[in-house]
Amino acid sequence: MLTKLILVRHAESTWNQTGRYQGRIDTELSDQGQKQASLLAERLQSVPVAAIYASPLRRALHTAITIGVAQNMDIRVEPDLTEIDHGAWNGLLPDEVEKRFGPLLQQWLVSPSKVQMPGGESLVDVSRRATTVLSRILADHSGGTVVVCTHDAVLKVLIADIIGMHLDRFWSFGICNASISIVECNQGSNRLLCLNDTCHLGPYRTETDEQAL
């Protein structure tokens, strides 16, 4: 039975504006992010949705709530959709990470699957928890359309798993704030229909360096 998965990255946060590594830090949406969330909700308003799932972090949850209001639907919070834990990198700017963790940062940019964040997670950790919860979501809503609102790293590892891509190609594509990626799932056969669609944002699209998650 065909199930459609709409993968959404949260709208722009205050720390997306400054480029800080957010990880598990619970940042708010920026003013532009709130506008992005409204445009995203407008884009999805006519789509018949069976359920909306979100990370508990406010930047994702508030994005999902905006979609949910347009759909007249409550949000289902899933802790395993939370962003990667950057550990000691949380709250730092990229140049601060480079000064303190230069060799590890270079490995993160070249071979990200092999990096264990100091005091945090690895991409393998994130992939394990995120793919497990996604399998459960798909099983619970077979034949329907489900929105999953989460974070950059989580979306990248999920898409990598869906298309059979190695985690070391993590930097091969970007996922913008308030973007949509759509996957059709049919009894274990998955098809990526679109990736990082931001046409609904117009001039409100965030143009930032995606390396600071």
Protein language model regions, located:
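Acidic, low-complexity terminal tails and accessory targeting/binding regions
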Residues: M1-K4, M73, I84-K99, A139, ...
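Short active-site segment of divalent metal-dependent hydrolases/proteases
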Residues: S13, V154-L155
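Phosphate-coordination/substrate-recognition cap region in phosphate-metabolizing enzymes
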Residues: S38-Q106
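A charged, well-structured terminal subsegment
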Residues: Q107-V110, Q116
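Short basic (Lys/Arg) and small-residue
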Residues: H151
